[in-house]
Amino acid sequence: MPLASRVTLGAGCYWGTDKFIVKDFQKRFPGSVKNASVGFMSPDPNAMKNPSYRQVCSGSTGHVEVLDLELTDPQAHYEELIRFFYMFHDPTTKNRQGNDMGSQYSSYIFTYDQEQSKVASRVTKELQDHISRGTLNSFESETVKTKIGDATVYYKAMQEHQDYLASNPNGYCNHYFRFKSWPKA
């Protein structure tokens, strides 16, 4: 069954998520990403409609800061993207990435079809197995807390937040590579 081409990921502050995927993931897989933007999505389909950045940052809306993108070839790149997603943020912290705290900084994989959900769950289990075996020990705790759930409504963030680190190379980013390549099984 074919995978959906749309992908929405929460990995803490969306500026770093955008930079690591749009720039760094595409270094590994040139031309793999198109139509990327940062914004907000809530796991709750009944969450506040069209929240502002300030409202999301208050932690009261239930929205997660996300990168929303389209893959040119989801069959070839979705699984690699999910692995890459786990390489540059800490999926073992709940509602936090570094100094950024609050539910808006959750580690979250929003899925658009059953195949995406299966792949995301399998890769997440692989990561947990590597952590449990001690193959990977670059995270704060030993339990993956990333949530996987159905995508809901995406709200694009204000224009000045789009491509932020490309325009402000010295801007705030707490993401970094915790490991450089996915361990062998």
How should these model regions be labeled?
Residues 1-185:
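Flexible coil/turn and secondary-structure edge motifs
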